[in-house]
Amino acid sequence: MNIQETIQTLREELNQHNYNYYVLDNATISDYDFDIKLKELQDLENKHPEFFDEDSPTQRVGGTVTKNFKTIAHQYRMYSLDNSYSKEDLIDWENRIQRVLGNVNLQYTCELKYDGASISISYQNGKLVQALTRGDGFQGDEVTNNIKTIKSIPLKLKGDYPERFDIRGEIILPFAGFEKMNQELIEIGETPYSNPRNTASGSLKLQDSAEVAKRPLECLLYTVAGNNLPFKTQFEGLESARKWGFKVPNEAKLVNSMQEVFDFIDYWDVHRHKLPYETDGVVIKVNSIHSQEELGYTAKSPRWAIAYKFKSEQASTKLKSISYQVGRTGAITPVANLEPVQLAGTIVKRASLHNADQIEKLDIRINDTVFVEKGGEIIPKIIAVDLEKRPENSEVTQYITHCPECETELVRNAGEANHYCPNFYGCPPQIIGRIQHYISRKAMDIEGLGGETVALLFKNGLVHNYADLYELKVEDILHLERMAQKSAENLVNGVEKSKEIPFESVLFALGIRFVGETVAKKLAKHYKNIDALSQASLMDLILVDEIGERIARSVIEFFENEENKIIIERLKKYGIQFETVERVNPNATEKFIGKTFVVSGVFSQFSRDELKKAIEDNGGKVGSSISAKTDFVVAGDNMGPAKLEKATKLNIPILSEDEFITKLNESE
């Protein structure tokens, strides 16, 4: 055997041992013997660099330093899941599905919901080429070098696999590894980590991949995304992923009814604490991929999947004090400061009290013993008071009447739960919060400028609103704490680059109350520019798709405010994009203007997205459900019987794929 063959044999042996241990949980070699073989391979590779292979087991130890993580678009969007908290919720979900599919017999895949950091890993020709964090679902941070250090993730695949696909999973930190890491920190006098989930998530963003390699992270895979995949069901997809070398949890189960879903939930609600890692629920997916395609997606989540959350854990502790926070819109949020208590794997020191009504409803008082619950919330909540332990001298909590930051008298609008500080342009947290919102990734996405720096700029009198950002010069900010020449230049350059951000994002960045990302996109698309929007009447706004009276009034109030008018004029002067830039499609026409289409089924010449784009490029609108307002239904193979029946009943023309293409190619 020559040197190259020896190296290749060692690599194959070590890869197989890694797979046996980290994926199959079956050690087939002692740690000592494994290390001896790994050292032998390292020595041979060092002596013969001409045989270097980036997928060698020796490259698992990391060593690459990443100073800035690139943000890259997901090829296939990473959706969130809708949550359910009762079996009744699941029955309602199944009923909604059946109304679309036509009361067919359904199978479901039940999988445990692991509490970690979501990841999307891309493979091409059997090799790992890229790994992205979830990010906002549309784009994520590239963490490929760090992901390659996790031994349960294959660098090369086994068997017969698609040429290109993405696989999604959860990066988790098992309890044993987490406890070992914390024990090592305690021994050297360092602060231990708070919980496995945050530690796993933070590990992905460490700059030195060698540090990531030291952490006992694992990856549990749960879905494959791609075109022309070699399976027709979710469960077959999991089995295929196992054959390719991925660690797919064995707990996943294929069931034939909602009752079997309930049985799965009941079993794991009792036995989940025996698992070596955190799980907070069950994910239920329609098993048939064809049915998944038929059901489609909402703006945020797949209609064919839902998460069932296990009931929250509770703990009791003492309420030490109540503090009040001011948000960017002036909303006051009371927060309970608690004696630290262990809850669901974390140390809890604070809990949300929501508003004055909640404090009054629970009759919460300082020094009370309270019951704290942690569900899906970032901050836990108080659910009850232990009245038997209440001190005799306790006093009823009086909700504050003035802003804790600027001392302005608070207001409470009719029908709203929150109190507000009306000092919109003079209250420091509101000013800072608005600027922080303006610079955020989904808004102006200003690189080199973070929330702490915004607070520092305000504290030093350099900014009082987001228009002031465009007046900043490097020499103005060099004297700030932790601000070097390069940092100052990056900040100013980031602000300058934000002038390229499109109108819909600018509109969201302005921070108009009730105008989120989706609403901002609709308004930008409808009005085309800021001047037309600012002059719109209440009735004009309400007529825009999905814009109700509450949003419309908020938009009008924003543009009627003199301070806002001044800020917008300044932003115009600085060159901010206040007009929609129409992207010209040379093949676009107006032949479908005023027509609404519903697309259903599976197509051979178009993907569903391509078909929808063809409709929109030619002036048409794509609806999600069939109604009297639908003009055409484009029906692919295996169109749902319920949709077919409804379209027929309403006498809506049903076009085959070929008929649609003919219609598309007709001259106007």
UniProtKB/Swiss-Prot annotation:
User: InterPro entries in the record, alphabetically?
Assistant: BRCT_dom, BRCT_dom_sf, DisA/LigA_HHH, DNA_ligase, DNA_ligase_CS, DNAligase_adenylation, DNAligase_N, NA-bd_OB-fold
Sequence positions that bind Zn(2+): 403, 406, 421, 427
Q: What is this protein's function? A: DNA ligase that catalyzes the formation of phosphodiester linkages between 5'-phosphoryl and 3'-hydroxyl groups in double-stranded DNA using NAD as a coenzyme and as the energy source for the reaction. It is essential for DNA replication and repair of damaged DNA.
**Keyword field:** DNA damage, DNA repair, DNA replication, Ligase, Magnesium, Manganese, Metal-binding, NAD, Zinc
Question: Is Transit peptide one of the keywords?
Answer: no
> Which catalytic reaction applies to this protein?
NAD(+) + (deoxyribonucleotide)n-3'-hydroxyl + 5'-phospho-(deoxyribonucleotide)m = (deoxyribonucleotide)n+m + AMP + beta-nicotinamide D-nucleotide
Record's protein name: DNA ligase
Q: What class of enzyme is it?
A: ligase
Q: Which NCBIfam families match?
A: dnlj (TIGR00575), PRK07956.1 (NF005932)
Start and end residues of each BRCT domain = 587-668
In its UniProt record, which GO terms are filed under biological process? DNA repair; DNA replication
PROSITE patterns from the UniProt entry: BRCT (PS50172), DNA_LIGASE_N2 (PS01056)
Where is NAD(+) annotated to bind? Answer: 31-35, 80-81, 111, 134, 170, 285, 309
